[in-house]
């Protein structure tokens, strides 16, 4: 079996006296779509933010595509490893976080130009293709303020893909959208999942998406992965009463 593209070992995260993550261990294979779900406060978003070190773990080790970083005091070498790890991860947030003063195409091109130091012609061609992939090529020269929430989130997905990450992290990407706009973002994510080109870790309460797209589901409870399995396993016969109670409440 090939090495996992994401490996998390003994991950702990505390904020003061509050322990939010209590020892997470998980391996995720290339091309896998892992849906993380659970009640508010169970540690889902903190888990994602620790993977790309937007939150610094209190304890544990994280490996993404061969770049391994352990918890500890910041050092020059560790900061370098974190920068390398982040180039392998793209992240889509609840809020779109697009640069309001930049056109859509410039938002998508920014990281490959500034961080990746790639040639402008190549970056522009790739960015236009990414916008076409998410159905936004006709809005390339618009500014974010002129877009709907669903359109902005689709641009945010294209922007995250522009650095050609090996892992995409989605932190409740539809939670800030009006109900009628959710489907357009989920459709883009489904096409990305169907391509099997990118590993996806998705925090969401959209159980229809999970049932259709996920290769694995992980139920977070009280800072731990209480149960994991295929959608068929968890929807039809969850082993934990907590998992069953949660699914009964949201389905």
Region spans (language model):
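C-terminal boundary and immediately downstream tail of ABC-type ATPase nucleotide-binding domains
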Residues: 220-221, 228-251
């Amino acid at each position: 079996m090939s090495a996992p593209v994401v490996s998390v070992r003994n991950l702990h995260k505390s904020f003061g006296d509050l322990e939010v993550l209590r020892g997470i261990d998980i391996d995720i294979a290339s091309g896998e779509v892992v849906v993380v779900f659970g009640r508010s406060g169970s540690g889902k978003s903190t888990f994602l933010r620790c993977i790309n070190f937007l939150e610094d773990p209190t304890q544990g080790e994280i490996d993404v595509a061969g770049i391994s970083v352990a918890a500890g005091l910041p050092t020059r070498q560790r900061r370098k490893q974190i920068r390398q790890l982040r180039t392998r991860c793209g992240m889509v947030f609840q809020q779109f976080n697009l640069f309001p003063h930049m056109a859509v195409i410039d938002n998508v091109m920014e990281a490959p130009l500034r961080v990746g130091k790639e040639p402008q012609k190549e970056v522009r061609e790739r960015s236009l293709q990414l916008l076409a992939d998410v159905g936004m090529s006709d809005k390339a020269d618009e500014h974010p303020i002129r877009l709907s929430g669903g359109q902005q989130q689709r641009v945010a997905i294209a922007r995250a893909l522009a650095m050609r990450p090996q892992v995409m992290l989605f932190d409740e990407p539809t939670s800030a959208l009006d109900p009628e706009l959710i489907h357009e973002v989920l459709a883009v994510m489904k096409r990305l999942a169907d391509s099997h080109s990118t590993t996806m870790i998705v925090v969401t309460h959209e159980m229809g998406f999970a049932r259709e797209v996920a290769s694995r589901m992980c139920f977070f409870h009280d800072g731990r992965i209480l149960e994991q399995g295929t959608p068929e396993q968890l929807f039809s016969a969850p082993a934990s009463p907590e998992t069953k109670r949660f699914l009964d409440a949201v389905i």
